[in-house]
Amino acid sequence: MIDGQPITLGGREFVAPPVPFSCMRRFADVFEGRASPTVEVMADIVFAALKRNYPDLDQKTFEDECLDVGNLNLAFMAVMQASSAREADHPGEA
């Protein structure tokens, strides 16, 4: 399991790791601060990160059973914190 931020979504415990590079590249405008993420983009980013630790996670089931209006921002912030914390702790590490 990849280290990250612990988070409870829909009554399930998850560890939200940093986003994979492919996700960062896909949503570069969000990660570089050139655009604000839409709700759909936030959900996609959260799912991409969690999929690293939970490969059997299904996106539709995850969005229907775990994400909701009350926790999407929290989940997104946990993923973003995990992504920036990893970068700050290990600068230049490949």
Where are these regions (language model features)?
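A short, charged
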Residues: 38-55
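Charged interaction scaffolds used for protein-protein
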Residues: 1-13, 21-37, 54-94
